[in-house]
Amino acid sequence: MANSANTNTVPKLYRSVIEDVINDVRDIFLDDGVDEQVLMELKTLWENKLMQSRAVDGFHSEEQQLLLQVQQQHQPQQQQHHHHHHHQQAQPQQTVPQQAQTQQVLIPASQQATAPQVIVPDSKLIQHMNASNMSAAATAATLALPAGVTPVQQILTNSGQLLQVVRVANGAQYIFQPQQSVVLQQQVIPQMQPGGVQAPVIQQVLAPLPGGISPQTGVIIQPQQILFTGNKTQVIPTTVAAPTPAQAQITATGHQQPQAQPAQTQAPLVLQVDGTGDTSSEEDEDEEEDYDDDEEEDKEKDGAEDGQVEEEPLNSEDDVSDEEGQELFDTENVVVCQYDKIHRSKNKWKFHLKDGIMNLNGRDYIFSKAIGDAEW
């Protein structure tokens, strides 16, 4: 009893740790703009790694029991497949109704190697998905509700056989089949017309391999696109290889979707820039002449005001500017001294100088008193 209790507790502990981590980082993923499908893939990858390592026994006990049942039913199913093979080829293909209530979904397999496919009902798993309020990515992530089970998941059995587990879109069954080269296709057609069905149709099937169909009773769904026009359903089968005449396009009677109306083109509005009745150039010339006259009058007024305000000060001509001083020092016969008195009679000048220095003919002379005459 202790061993069984221990084996039941360890998988629950690992499962609770995974659930807690995924729930804690969900808000961080959403804040960073990462889709929730990435989070579900991370959870699935984590569980697959733990299951493949075989570190925890009984981590996927329900799946392992189902796999054992699949292995036991391989031989009887093969005989039953050969018995009903021709009967299935004679039945016409059926399309999915508007309210999908199918209980069995079969995946087409190769005709040469008729690998058995066993459908195992799953009554314990509950599908909690609101298809009307979820995006395509969120819907695809919600389809992988069972822990460790994705739309296409590889599971290694105790006998070393590699199987694939497929979760059906209606959440009622598992489909187990041996490892084959298949391609997962998921098509979500959100084109809803008024009066049609209210829930979007979600189709999740496997692309057919070259060959026939799987000899198993039930509804056979080929990879196709389902478009709703009014209350009718239009089914367009799609195949991987080149279509044959037998695979012609099947269309149901109904109203066709209205084509997009071309945008109404408005007549271009052309503004007249120049013409026979245009007199804008003459008006512009008149305005420019008036503007020039106004500028001249303003300049004259400003000049008169400046003349009244900025009058030259008295004795301005007697002031010696810097330029004149520079020219004085550049000349020859320079005298620098003090003076006692200066006499002037018309153009004759008489100087009484003292304590100075003079430069005459390139020579300097120092004096204490000097008298000189000049005319200019």
From Swiss-Prot:
Keywords: Acetylation, Nucleus, Phosphoprotein, Transcription, Transcription regulation. GO terms for biological process: transcription initiation at RNA polymerase II promoter. Its main location: nucleus. The alpha and beta subunits are postranslationally produced from the precursor formby TASP1. The cleavage promotes proteasomal degradation. Residues 280-329 have a biased composition (Acidic residues). The record marks 274-275 as: Cleavage. DNA binds at residues 343-344. Gene3D superfamilies: 1.10.287.100, Transcription factor IIA (TFIIA), beta-barrel domain. Residues 69-79, 89-105 have a biased composition (Low complexity). The modification N-acetylalanine is found at residue 2. The modification Phosphoserine is found at residues 280-281, 316, 321. InterPro entries: TFIIA_asu/bsu (IPR004855), TFIIA_b-brl (IPR009088). GO terms for cellular component: transcription factor TFIIA complex. The keyword Nucleus applies. It holds the Pfam family TFIIA. TFIIA is a heterodimer of the large unprocessed subunit 1 and a small subunit gamma. It was originally believed to be a heterotrimer of an alpha (p35), a beta (p19) and a gamma subunit (p12). TFIIA forms a complex with TBP. TFIIA is a component of the transcription machinery of RNA polymerase II and plays an important role in transcriptional activation. TFIIA in a complex with TBP mediates transcriptional activity. Belongs to the TFIIA subunit 1 family. This is Transcription initiation factor IIA subunit 1.
